[in-house]
Amino acid sequence: MLPTTVESLFAVAKEPLELPEKELLTLLWDQVERDINSAGFSISKPHSISVNDQAQHLLRFLEELPSHALPGLLYRIDVSESALFSSMEGFQPLVWSILQREAIKVTLRLRFS
């Protein structure tokens, strides 16, 4: 099942993160941008910071990305092998896998920085 809420994306945090949802979502998108930029691409900000808008914006970005560039981007984001296999089902599961991975990075940064 694909995550559709902030809570499901940040479920890796055993204890709730002490930040408002809007701030968590801003940190999540900042991490997405950081990884995409470090892979040599750029992505604009979504119209709103909601989880679904971020997912739709990332989906459009991936659909427009040249196919030869996708493996390098996924390597940079550090998407799991199982998520790569799910990408064969389409970009939608891959988008959520990317957002979940980025949420893990945000959680680790908040906990250990």
Please annotate each region the language model reported.
Residues 84-113:
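Amphipathic alpha-helical binding modules
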Residues 46, 50, 73-76, 88, ...:
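Residue-level signal for alpha-helical context at structural boundaries
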Residues 1-31:
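N-terminal leader/targeting peptides and immediately adjacent processing regions
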Residues 3-7, 40, 46, 76:
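Intrinsically disordered, low-complexity regions
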Residues 27, 31-72:
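Amphipathic alpha-helical interaction modules
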Residues 18, 22, 48, 88, ...:
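Conserved phosphate/pyrophosphate-binding and hydrolysis machinery centered on Walker-type P-loop NTPases
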Residues 56-95:
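Amphipathic protein-protein interaction modules
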